[in-house]
Amino acid sequence: NMQPFTTWNNNSSANMSNFQESGINFKFQSPKWNVVKYDEHLAHKKVSNALQPTKAVDFLGIHDNRQLFLVEVKNYRGHTHDAETQEVLQAKGEELMRRIAVKGRDTIATVTNSARFSTNDEDFFTRINQLLLDNQKKIVIIACIELDIAGEKEHKARMSVWMQKLKQKLAWLHAAKISINPIENISAVLPDTEILFV
């Protein structure tokens, strides 16, 4: 039986609570959270510097010492109709979902080794690996996608198609809880979090 950590929550450098990503402020406002901005973390950069391209999700977090969260944020508000955005959104979101799935895959691949060489967040990454290996625990993957949308109905239909695509691409993860939400709905799936547009 693996012992949960009790000492690292208060002094880990992972214990910051306020992050900005794509013009959105994420406030993880409970001591139950331990979160890192993984795409900027040394653990990810060590791999991505050595091997391009290696991708990462925006946030990697543990809630209440027992639930692992991978969160990717895409804010296309004001840019939904740009050529570059349209390219990513085409084919019913196929390319966007592929990119998000790759970030999930690469994050899990790099995080497995992080516990070996991460000096400042070793306990954090060790706990993440324990959670990854515990098949009683679901890995929560949240894609937070913000768009300029014509109608609510169209938006819901699109999200449901995207969700199926993302689930297919991450089916190998087995016990994963996958959701795609706009900002306004994100607190329903991300506990103890306050999210605001900057």
Regions found by a protein language model. Give the residues of each.
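Basic, amphipathic N-terminal segments that precede the first structured/catalytic domain
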Residues: 2-57, 191-198
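Short Lys/Arg-rich amphipathic alpha-helical segments
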Residues: 53-56, 93, 101-104, 151-154
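Catalytic cores of nucleic-acid endonucleases
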Residues: 76-144, 165-174
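Short beta-alpha junction loops
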Residues: 145-149
